Amino acid sequence: LKYFNFLANASVCRGIDLKNDIPIAYIPPDLIRLQIEKNIHFLNNTLEVMLVSKQDKLGEFETQTNGYQLLNYKCSYTFSRYENIHQLIFQVTNILNETYYNHLSKIKMIMPEAGRGFNINYRMHF
């Protein structure tokens, strides 16, 4: 599609204790990230889907975490003023308010990750 950018990346990590033939602790689950981006002059819109698999290849003292899907949105407006580049950024994270647990979190047994969130940022590049 004209004027759209499609981005995709994947992350797969394996760690095995060769001496004991067991998984190493704190290995992240498999992840696929898909993004569609639309630029309109100085306005950039990005919709992102993150697909994270369950982690059941567990090291000592670890507990299994379920897989999850997240939907995120980011809109940024870029402009120049006084020889500097400025950006206004609006983000909505976890749009669907998914309850999920990050396998690498030290507090996953206590509470899930944050639900839907809104962020407004200002950046100045000089």
Feature-to-residue mapping (PLM):
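Surface-exposed cleft-lining segments at the edges of enzyme active sites
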Residues: L18-K19
